[in-house]
Amino acid sequence: SRETLSIINEKGGEAILFKADLTKSDEVQKLKAFCVEKCGCSLDILINNSGGLIARKKLAEQDEAFYDSVMDLNFKSLFLVSNAFVGMIPSGGAVVNLSSLAARDGGGGGSSLYAASKGAITTYTRSLAKELGPDGIRVNSVCPGLINTTFHDIFTPDEARKRVAESTPLRREGTSEDVANLVYFLASDNAAFITGANYDINGGLAFS
């Protein structure tokens, strides 16, 4: 995050950092208060980008605590942030949620709860698009496939990554820049008539 902050500032932008546990309501409220103090009461774009796999576990290996940790990290955090900040978004604003290809196809081995939590995000995106549309607020999500990030560095074996990348029409993994460009588009006025959409970005690995 500090590296990203430096890049933004070096390119003439202005960015700030605030550390918070987005699975806890009181922490989200502290984040909101910080944003109001630093940036005022208006928020044109909200990008919900928290989440993670935590671990690959089959059903027999999962317990209630693991269920709660995965759902809290991926879906509860998105709910709490959206709930806290939606009142600050004016007409013409946009929300972009980070879902996953796993929401479409159930994910890889040991990721059933992760896939379910991301599936909740795709449905929630559609619901919020209907609810917030009359207020002029658009809500969309992106569903990345195999992206070259620390997520797969940690949880996906190199051989499996190579096999999957070679099976895509574009014959490569995606990059964080690929995903960021799509998020930028959906947040911009170029997507002014798009809402409730869950955009695949996976190099043709899967179609929906």
List where the protein language model places each region.
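Short-chain dehydrogenase/reductase
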Residues: S1-S42, I54-A55
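Short C-terminal tail/terminal secondary-structure segment
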Residues: R56, V183-Y184, T195-S208
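Substrate-binding pocket helix/loop in short-chain dehydrogenase/reductase
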Residues: K57-L59, D63-S69, H152, V164
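Active-site loop-to-helix junction immediately N-terminal to the catalytic Tyr of the SDR YXXXK motif
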Residues: Q62, G106-A115, S127
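Active-site helix of classical SDR
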Residues: S82, S117, T125
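Alpha-helical segment proximal to the catalytic Tyr-Lys
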Residues: G87, K130-P134, A192
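Residue(s) in the substrate-gating loop at a strand-loop-helix junction
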Residues: S100
